[in-house]
């Protein structure tokens, strides 16, 4: 993980990027197409690099935030604190609303900043009710517990079909089953489509 981050960042520098001009790294806490989480030490190396070079670590939690991974935010699996967190979708349960969370010294730099979906009253009211249900119904804990059950079932499938399911990926209620061509690690899109149709 950390070595891979070093390789990636050094490739940027070889292409002419000046390390002192890197304002921020912006990442999703996982890649949604396959519930692919980064290695912990990759993100930790990114955090260390950001601190050393006075740049920001910004995490996009628009898709991954609000409990679906078994933690309130997906970045919590990495043991780092981002400087800014971008939120949307899950914050209100369905209505258009976005938010940027972060360290107060950054948020207070320009209090006039606004956004299209940042303060619409109906969406804000829905978000408050939605967030209350997270606490009252312990939805994050529930996602974590159900995720452990789901992992057990997925591992049973993986054990039953090792030729087709070489690996699974995810946390909480976010999982991907990688269905591959028999005996290989090449994804089998046609077979996957047939399964989805059934």
Regions found by a protein language model. Give the residues of each.
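Conserved N-terminal phosphate-binding loop of PLP-dependent enzymes in the Aspartate aminotransferase
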Residues: 1-198
């Amino acid at each position: 993980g950390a070595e891979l981050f070093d390789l990636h960042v050094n490739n940027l520098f070889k292409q002419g990027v000046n390390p002192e001009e890197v304002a921020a790294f912006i990442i999703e806490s996982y890649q949604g197409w396959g519930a692919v989480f980064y290695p912990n030490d990759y993100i930790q190396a990114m955090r260390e690099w950001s601190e050393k070079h006075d740049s920001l670590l910004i995490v996009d939690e628009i898709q991954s935030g609000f409990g679906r991974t078994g933690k309130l935010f997906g970045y919590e699996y990495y043991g780092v604190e981002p400087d800014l967190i971008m939120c949307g979708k899950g914050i209100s349960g369905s209505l258009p609303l976005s938010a940027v969370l972060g360290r107060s010294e950054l948020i207070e730099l320009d209090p006039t900043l606004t956004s299209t979906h940042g303060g619409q009253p109906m969406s804000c009211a829905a978000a408050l009710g939605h967030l209350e249900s997270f606490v009252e119904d312990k939805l994050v804990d529930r996602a974590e517990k159900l995720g452990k059950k789901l992992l057990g079932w997925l591992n049973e499938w993986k054990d039953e079909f090792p030729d087709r399911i070489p690996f699974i990926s995810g946390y909480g209620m976010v999982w991907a089953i990688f269905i591959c061509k028999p005996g290989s690690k090449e994804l089998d899109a046609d077979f996957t489509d047939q399964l989805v149709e059934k």
